[in-house]
């Protein structure tokens, strides 16, 4: 069809002038809508495509690439407020590399995704502050560096616009703080180096932040950085009688985008007096914070500290063992890929099978599924990037029913473990040499098993299934799958998938592994890090609970211990996680309540550590359970009824954390208590100042390590150690004694109110 030029005026007042193909705009042309919007540029069979310029009646204008009626390619958009974006577009939204200068002269230069900052980018504020690092959905996330106009600098991790995770804060005057943050507030242990003291290498620290113990930091979704969600432009219609989308949809509404303010001076310095005779250049402070409140401080020598300091959250070294050595590096990567492939295959195969009650044959030796996964794929398996491997799945029907019993959706289970975000290797808290992996959403822990542990698990599985089915509140480890991978060079690796007892958005400040024995049950202070799992002799608290909550707890502990005793199991322990709540009246003194403020919101306050503090007010509140009001669900591996509390008229209860969440209280999950600090004589800790004696805590717990039988080897170990130590103090002992000692010890940890 011949090309020709012409003008055409439409009944609604629109006007077109330019080249046409038949009656359709094609080539160069200009279209004016009746409201004043004008496009001039290339057309392709009735669609705006190619190079062009679009000016909306609102005053917004775009000049650049179009495709199929969309802003698509590279172009520059000037909004009515004079903010300018120049960069990549995809389907009417900013997507790719781009630079935006805001109307107040703030500047962002970096990657965009679906209209929001996402990826690497730099944001400069007009007041001189600047952030360089990662972004996610318009907010500062993951690794990034913030430098304030006053010279302060923070290098570390972020989440939803907050300082969150490991980081180092360097003050303009030379002071330095290494530690962890939670939603913009210091939370957990850290080290403060006054100006002039010997400080660890900042360069080395920054490199170490590339490695994190969990690989992610998942807490509150609340954010303080509010970047507008851009509304997509409507497509430019093919019909010439309908106008192009209005330009105002591309303009940014007034921005509410502020940066973190520098840490207040009151948060830097201790108010405790220093002896004039002390060498201030040698003194550093090991501090512990709780939601921004300083609760504990230890004065140390920088010389003593220099060889101890390790960046928080860096995986600690584990002594080499055959399995650990084998699974280093490339082999470990292949192993994770194989595990994900195998679980995807297993769940996909068993899910369509109609649900039924398990039979004796479902536990037997023939209850195994085997499959070979060649690299190039087969009729039953997909091609993959790992090495050839063989997969064995144990008792698939049993574990399918267990997953359903704990209300785990098959698709969500696969996505948690087999999703694109993958698995994260975490350091082992024990001496077993096992390797632990954490799912990307923290819901599941995967642990390597010894052959003997696998055999114990399979033998106990029928009774375990019965016990878990009869007791919905059991504290015993939840097992969701047992698998074996045989790599092409013959190495066999066995895995068990378990529920993560600490799957919570609350920060776990303390972790304890409690057995009730005392011989060797302590942690050397030089080895204690932010996420170290402590032991019996390290526990300096006793926990006071509501009467009915405590009764429910010990009722289940008795049942679980009796079950383990009947199976001849020993060496199990109570894994205890504690979330401390900060004393509310100090939040405004020791740490700025709004860490996102552009300027310091707190003046310098001299806070003395030696002054007396009254018992803090309750940071927790039990209220009658309201299913529709609970905004944070318990971990996905938890089932059972909501607990009742004596203090609320024996009603089912929720736990309110003021300003944080309303949580459903279940056995071992979200259980409130008061932690009473016990005074312990310890010369090494004479420089430690404990600010409070009573804390509100949220308790998480479960019974773990239940795969050790009291066999001949353990009997010999008990006999030998009994010759050296008091038999009641050593961990290894016969099952009935172990059970009684374990329960008696927990009675001391959770004493009955008098």
UniProtKB/Swiss-Prot annotation:
InterPro entries xrefs: MORN, PIno-4-P-5_kinase_pln, PInositol-4-P-4/5-kinase_C_sf, PInositol-4-P-4/5-kinase_core, PInositol-4-P-5-kinase_N, PInositol-4/5-P-5/4-kinase
EC number: 2.7.1.68
GO biological process, one term: phosphatidylinositol metabolic process
Record region (Activation loop): 710-731
Pfam families in UniProt: MORN, PIP5K
Gene Ontology CC: membrane
Keywords: ATP-binding, Kinase, Nucleotide-binding, Repeat, Transferase
Segments annotated as MORN repeats: 16-38, 39-61, 62-84, 85-107, 108-130, 131-153, 154-176, 177-198
Enzyme class: transferase
GO molecular function, one term: 1-phosphatidylinositol-4-phosphate 5-kinase activity
Reaction(s) this enzyme catalyzes, per UniProt: a 1,2-diacyl-sn-glycero-3-phospho-(1D-myo-inositol 4-phosphate) + ATP = a 1,2-diacyl-sn-glycero-3-phospho-(1D-myo-inositol-4,5-bisphosphate) + ADP + H(+)
SMART domains the record matches: MORN (SM00698), PIPKc (SM00330)
Domain PIPK: start-end pairs: 329-750
Gene3D superfamilies associated with the record: 2-Layer Sandwich, Histone H3 K4-specific methyltransferase SET7/9 N-terminal domain, Phosphatidylinositol Phosphate Kinase II Beta
PANTHER family xrefs: PHOSPHATIDYLINOSITOL 4-PHOSPHATE 5-KINASE 7 (PTHR23086:SF104), PHOSPHATIDYLINOSITOL-4-PHOSPHATE 5-KINASE (PTHR23086)
Name of the molecule in the record: Phosphatidylinositol 4-phosphate 5-kinase 7
Species assigned in the record: Arabidopsis thaliana (Mouse-ear cress)
